[in-house]
Amino acid sequence: MDKLLVGLSVLFANVKALFYKVAYAGRVRAELIVASPYFPSVRVRNGGMIACARVKFRRRCSIFADGGVVDIGRGTFLNNDCSINSNQSIVIGENTLLGEGVKIYDHNHRVIDGVVSHSEFDSAPVSIGKDCWIGSNVVILPGVSICEKVIIGSGSVVTKSITTPGVYVTENVKLKKIN
């Protein structure tokens, strides 16, 4: 019975992927054989596009491409409650793991004369290399580039690019390399 339920869940996820491909007229590119019974909440607007291949999702993940491009590499895993929000470009390399609650943004609300704009944004591309592990509740902000084979500890806020493989954690409100 469990195998039947899993099979039906995977079938439903593939139907959902097909629906997104049709509804968004080619702006969502996903292989129809989704590797998990879950498929994320998706929003594509203003010429945005989402591409993913053999990506495994857990529950309550969301991907928004509001004029931006989201490209998730083959074999990547997104745990529960991950959010990817793009106005420009977010690229995640192959075989990368995202822990629960990871948030990735390539834009911030623009602040004009001390007032936060609801409709204007400052954007910069984000890239994460292949074979990375992004720990639970990590936030990755605009303009960050992370090289391959990087581990980022839980709860870290990444505001600067990482160019050397290793393990990184936030310490005293600064991201510090620990090995």
Protein language model regions, located:
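Domain-scale signature associated with acetyltransferase and cell-envelope carbohydrate enzymes
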Residues: 1-105, 129-130, 138-140, 148, ...
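A generic "structured core" feature
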Residues: 141-142, 146-157
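Glycine-rich NAD(P)-binding loop of Rossmann-like domains
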Residues: 116-128
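Short helix N-cap motif at coil->helix boundaries in the Bergerat
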Residues: 160
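Extracellular/periplasm-exposed beta-strand and loop segments of Gram-negative cell-envelope proteins
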Residues: 108-109
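Nucleic acid-binding interface residues in structured DNA/RNA-binding domains
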Residues: 169-171
